Each structure stands twice: as structure tokens, then as C-alpha cells.
């Protein structure tokens, strides 16, 4: 027994074909939007690849770009099919291809749904990538004279200014690394010598941060050096006073930015997926309604359309049997090839 059977007359078939034609062209626009979102995400990831240890994954943006292009192609073709569906002469050339085309549409819908899920799952991989990338980027902040790293100072400074953040997890991360180049240290100074000697690794560590950590909204001039020394500044207590620095770490700021971007992209992709599923269901009804016409030459005759020719369990059983037959066919072919090669070996 057919699943979700619906009766169609000529008027209903015409309305269905026209509605699907319009929906397909809206879906082409949706495909362009998905393509644009994928391209934008790819650019945003590449833009900050230096603070992601150059190990960021482009699987999701590449997938979005791919399904965006495929959506435009499939829906343009479906729009043409719907336009030709009510002309018997034009429909005849599409008839042999409709079943395979619908199967491809179902597969495309599955892929689109998986891509939407991947958008929501990207956060986990980004978190570890950002943690390692930012840590290494901060280590190379001082290497302004080293080829291949001379740009890192500008990259980190611009990042902290743009995202209003400081350090990896917070401003105290800068206390643990030497971010001032040896080129700008006076090694004849007793203070510099003492600081370097007091460190096991011979690094010049200070309780200070780069200028890009300063919050311009603070009414007080920026205090970026001797942050933990209350006596070094007038009317200052670092434990109780709200520091005029960005308190948020850059990892959290970037993760929040990319998470919002990915959640928005995932939501849009899910909406497009629902739209595509609706179109595929509509195409199935149009296909079965046209196939079920008793007299194709008489456009006025009634017909029946359905979603599945049999019930869900029967359809699933038939699908499994066809897969088994395909597997057995491949096995027989392989055995035949082995038998043909055996005499040659002897």
C-alpha cells in the first residue's frame, strides 16, 4: 500500500508544478547564500591562521562552498523539470532520469544535513587549535627581527585591539613569557641583569603587557608596566581596582566570535535543508502523479501521487535486498575473474 497517497486533477498538478518551480529558484538563491557563508568563513579562518598554528580545519567552509554550488545546480535543473512537466512532449525526455535524479536529491539532502551538523561541532577543534596557536604567537611576539615571524607582533596587537582581549586566557599570560626583544634591552642595566639572572631560563620577564591590551574606555592613563606593584603608581591597588586593561582572554573572544558565526551558518543551512526536503517531497509527488496518469494524452484525467510506493518497513526491506543482490553480484564477478586467472597461473 502506497504511503501518504494524494489524488491529483489537472489543476492540482499545475499548481504543484508552478509552486515547485518557484521554490526551486528560491532554493538557488539559498544555495548562493550558503556558498557566500562558506567563502566568508574560509576567509575569516585564513585571516587568523597565524594564531591558529596554521592547523585550522577548512573542511566545514569547503563543504559549505561545495553544497552551495550543488544546490544551485540541482535546483536549477529541478526548476527546468517542473517547467517542462506539464508538456507531454517535453516531459518525455526527462521521464527516464527522474527516479535517479530523486535518489541523488535524497543523497544531497543527507549530505546537507551532515554539513549543518558539522557547523555546530566545529567549536571543539577550534578551541584546541586556538589555545596552541595563541600560545605560540605570544612566544614569537618579540621576534620582530626574525624572518617568518617579524609580522607576529602586528598580528597579535591588531587581534587584541579588534577583539578587545589580552593574552591567551587573560593578561597574566604575558607575565610568563619574554615579549620584549633583547634588541631593546639595556644589558648594562643592573635591573635587566638581575631579572635575567633570577629566571631559570634566562628570560627577561616583567609584570607588564603590550600596549594593545589597554582599554581606551578607562578614564585613567593606561598602566601597562609594574601591574602588580601598588607603590609604583599613585592611588593604585591591583587587587581591588578595576584595571584599565582588557580582562578577557583572546582565546575566549575568538572562540565566541567563531562560535556565533558557525551557529548562524548552521542555522541557515538547517533552514535550507528543510526547504530542500520539502522540494524533494514535492518532486516525488509530481513524479508519481504524472506517472500514474491513466491516459497521458488526456491532461484532464485524474491521477494519484504518493511518497513511497510501499510502506516504510516494506521499502526498507526491498532496499536491503537490493543491496544484498548488488553485493552478491560483485562477489560472483570477483570469483569469475579469479577462475579466469587460475589456468594462466598454472
From Swiss-Prot:
Side of membrane Lumenal, spans = 42-62, 123-264
Tissue expression summary = Retina (photoreceptor). In rim region of ROS (rod outer segment) disks.
Stretches of the chain found on the membrane's Cytoplasmic side: 1-18, 80-101, 284-346
Biological processes, Gene Ontology terms: cell adhesion; detection of light stimulus involved in visual perception; photoreceptor cell outer segment organization; protein heterooligomerization; protein homooligomerization; protein localization to plasma membrane; protein maturation; protein polymerization
Name the principal localization, coarsely classed.
Answer: membrane
Task: Report whether Transmembrane shows up as a keyword of the record.
Answer: yes
- Region (Interaction with MREG) residue spans: 341-346
- Membrane topology note: Multi-pass membrane protein
Keywords of the record: Cell adhesion, Cell projection, Disulfide bond, Glycoprotein, Membrane, Sensory transduction, Transmembrane, Transmembrane helix, Vision
Which molecular-function annotations from GO does this UniProt entry contain?
identical protein binding; protein homodimerization activity
> Which top-rank group of organisms is this from?
Eukaryota
Localization in the cell: Membrane; Cell projection, Cilium, Photoreceptor outer segment; Photoreceptor inner segment
Q: What Gene Ontology cellular component terms go with this record? A: cytoplasm; photoreceptor inner segment; photoreceptor outer segment; plasma membrane; protein-containing complex
- One Pfam family per UniProt: Tetraspanin
Q: Which InterPro entries match?
A: Peripherin/rom-1 (IPR000830), Peripherin/rom-1_CS (IPR018498), Peripherin_LEL (IPR042026), Tetraspanin/Peripherin (IPR018499), Tetraspanin_EC2_sf (IPR008952)
Carbohydrate-modified residues are: 53, 229, 263
Q: What is stated as this protein's family in its record?
A: Belongs to the PRPH2/ROM1 family.
Its biological function?
Essential for retina photoreceptor outer segment disk morphogenesis, may also play a role with ROM1 in the maintenance of outer segment disk structure. Required for the maintenance of retinal outer nuclear layer thickness. Required for the correct development and organization of the photoreceptor inner segment.
Q: How does it assemble?
A: Homodimer; disulfide-linked. Forms a homotetramer. Forms a heterotetramer with ROM1. Homotetramer and heterotetramer core complexes go on to form higher order complexes by formation of intermolecular disulfide bonds. Interacts with MREG. Interacts with STX3. Interacts with SNAP25.
- Name of the protein: Peripherin-2
Originating species = Bos taurus (Bovine)
What gene, per UniProt, encodes this protein? PRPH2
Amino acid at each position: 500500500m502506497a504511503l501518504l497517497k494524494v489524488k491529483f486533477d489537472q489543476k492540482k498538478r499545475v499548481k504543484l508544478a508552478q509552486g515547485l518551480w518557484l521554490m526551486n529558484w528560491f532554493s538557488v538563491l539559498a544555495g548562493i547564500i550558503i556558498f557566500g557563508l562558506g567563502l566568508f568563513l574560509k576567509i575569516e579562518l585564513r585571516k587568523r591562521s597565524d594564531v591558529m598554528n596554521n592547523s585550522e580545519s577548512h573542511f566545514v567552509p569547503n563543504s559549505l562552498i561545495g553544497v552551495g554550488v550543488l544546490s544551485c545546480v540541482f535546483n536549477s535543473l529541478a526548476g527546468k523539470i517542473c517547467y517542462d512537466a506539464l508538456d507531454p512532449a517535453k516531459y518525455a525526455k526527462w521521464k527516464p532520469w527522474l527516479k535517479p535524479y530523486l535518489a541523488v536529491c535524497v543523497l544531497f539532502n543527507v549530505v546537507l544535513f551532515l554539513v549543518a551538523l558539522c557547523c555546530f561541532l566545529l567549536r571543539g577543534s577550534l578551541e584546541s587549535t586556538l589555545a596552541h596557536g595563541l600560545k605560540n604567537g605570544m612566544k614569537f611576539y618579540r621576534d620582530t627581527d626574525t624572518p617568518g615571524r617579524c609580522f607576529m607582533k602586528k598580528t597579535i596587537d591588531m587581534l587584541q585591539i579588534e577583539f578587545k582581549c589580552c593574552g591567551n586566557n587573560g593578561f597574566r599570560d604575558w607575565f610568563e613569557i619574554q615579549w620584549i626583544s633583547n634588541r631593546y634591552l639595556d644589558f648594562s642595566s643592573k635591573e635587566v641583569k638581575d631579572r635575567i639572572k633570577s629566571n631559570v631560563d634566562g628570560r627577561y620577564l616583567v609584570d607588564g603587557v603590550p600596549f594593545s591590551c589597554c582599554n581606551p574606555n578607562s578614564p585613567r592613563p593606561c598602566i601597562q608596566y609594574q601591574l602588580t606593584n601598588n607603590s609604583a603608581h599613585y592611588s593604585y591597588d591591583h587587587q581591588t581596582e578595576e584595571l584599565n586593561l582588557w580582562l578577557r582572554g583572546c582565546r575566549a573572544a575568538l572562540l565566541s566570535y567563531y562560535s556565533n558565526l558557525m551557529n548562524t551558518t548552521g542555522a541557515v543551512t538547517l533552514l535550507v535543508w528543510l526547504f530542500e526536503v520539502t522540494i524533494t517531497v514535492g518532486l516525488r509527488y509530481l513524479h508519481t502523479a504524472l506517472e500514474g496518469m491513466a491516459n497521458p494524452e488526456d491532461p484532464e484525467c485524474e491521477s494519484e501521487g504518493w511518497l513511497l510506493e510501499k510502506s516504510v518497513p516494506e521499502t526498507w526491506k526491498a532496499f536491503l535486498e537490493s543491496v544484498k543482490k548488488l553485493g552478491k553480484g560483485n562477489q560472483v564477478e570477483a570469483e569469475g575473474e579469479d577462475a579466469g586467472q587460475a589456468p594462466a597461473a598454472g
